[in-house]
Amino acid sequence: GRFKLLELSLEAACFAKAAPLLEVGCATGEGSAHLAELGYTCVTGVDIDAEAIAQAREKFPGVSFVCADARHLPFAAGSFEGIISEAAFSVIDGKAEAAREYARVLAPGGLALLHDFAAAAESAHTQPGIPCLDGVQSMAGYRAVFEAAGFERVCESEEYGEYIGIAMSLGKAYGVPPT
């Protein structure tokens, strides 16, 4: 399903069910709610879009949602054992600032799990007509951002199954033919 890659990453991360987890770019809260459904009891979703946060709060009253900018998270240093971001980091303006904030709010030994689109090469990447693909970087570009923010170990893998379906749906929704 939609959250299969997230579930696999959570399994590998071995977070305790009571670990404080932050989903950055939660939109209307489905990912954060899914974490709660999996038994994680201390989940906070954050998004810059106040309307999306209002919808998330209405749909999932048992989960905490905060309207905030990923570059200026309103949490104390070391507040979270894990940060999750599902197809959201690529659309953040100021990725370096956001990555530094991720590092700041993570507890020592904490993990950031990002699932996002990546470009094949180093250059500015946009897909005319599909806003959520603006700002996509290569894997090397993302790695450089997180290493510069102080992350000690940056692991990456390429998974296509779930994202091919998403990309096809986006293309169809925005009237952009596959190339």
Question: Residue locations for each model-derived region?
Answer:
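A short glycine-rich, Lys/Arg-flanked "PGG" loop and its adjoining helix->strand segment in the class I
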Residues: 96-111
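Conserved alpha-helix/loop element of class I SAM-dependent methyltransferases that forms part
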Residues: 1-17
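A short acidic, Gly/Pro-enriched loop at the edge of an enzyme's catalytic core
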Residues: 71-82
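Short, glycine-/aromatic-enriched active-site segment of Class I SAM-dependent methyltransferases
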Residues: 116-134
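Class I SAM-dependent methyltransferase SAM/SAH-binding core
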Residues: 28-72
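Short alpha-helix
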Residues: 135-149
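C-terminal helical/coil "lid" or tail adjacent to the Rossmann-like core of SAM-dependent
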Residues: 157-179
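A short SAM/SAH-binding and catalytic strip from SAM-dependent methyltransferases
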Residues: 82-94
